[in-house]
Amino acid sequence: MNEKINIYLNFYKECLSPYSRSEYLKPFNHVVIFCREGNLKKDNKIFLDEGKAAYIHTSLDLNAGNNGAVLWCWELVDLENNGIRLSENDAKQYKEISELISIPKRQGDALIRCDTVSFPPSACAFTHTHAGPGIRVLLEGEIRIDGDQSSNLYKAGDAWFENGIEPVFAQATKETSSSFIRVIILPGEFIGKTSITYVNEEDLGKPKTQIYKGYIDEPLK
């Protein structure tokens, strides 16, 4: 039987001033960083450019570039250390979501995925579930997420959590294209495979208009 452990999946935004130093990772956690603006440097060389993502699981010292950096960060951290900040005092952090999830205890039995999902105007994602939990953040446009218990409209910069179990329906605005970036934790067998399952049989054969772009898809270390 696959033993599981409880761990926090957090999302926060961080604004670094030009050249400021930040120790992103401590021994107890894993971080996916998406560089929304600016860039990050390591040893005076570009480590992460604007619009790129990285999965970090070892202690690492990074500096913002000459224009600073706006970072969107997802972290996995154990229960004991969940309240500890990752970065130096000169950074501005804004934690927006903290959700307790369960993941396989054995190394390699879970994977971490970061990708974007884009929708043309008026497009939708039919009612579906996913094979694991994750946090989404809207990059552009507007999108409405309908679940069993609630319906919420999200705008650029808004973040939300999906547990993967509750079916959701996603409707993009008709005014413009919409897209979000997400980090989800999945069973290891889903590496390179879609995590989505459509709930209603009548939707299986319908055209799917959402477009995916992958950044990270690798075993959780």
Predicted segments — roles?
Residues M1-Y24, F28-H30, K92-A125:
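A short glycine-rich, His/Asp/Glu-containing loop-to-beta-strand
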Residues N6-I7, F47, H57-N89, G164-K193:
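Ligand-binding loop in jelly-roll beta-barrel domains
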Residues K13-S22, V32, N39-L62, F119, ...:
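Short acidic-glycine-tyrosine-enriched beta hairpin
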Residues S22-P27, G65, A125-H130, Q171-T173:
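Short histidine-centered beta-strand/loop micro-motifs
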Residues K26-K41, H130-I145, F180-P187:
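Short, conserved beta-strand element in jelly-roll/cupin
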Residues K45-F47, N89-S102, L204-G205, I211-I216:
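Local beta-strand/beta-hairpin segments that build beta-sheet-rich folds
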Residues Q107-A156:
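A contiguous binding-surface segment within folded domains or other stable secondary-structure elements
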Residues I191-K221:
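Acidic/histidine-enriched, glycine/proline-rich intrinsically disordered or flexible terminal extensions
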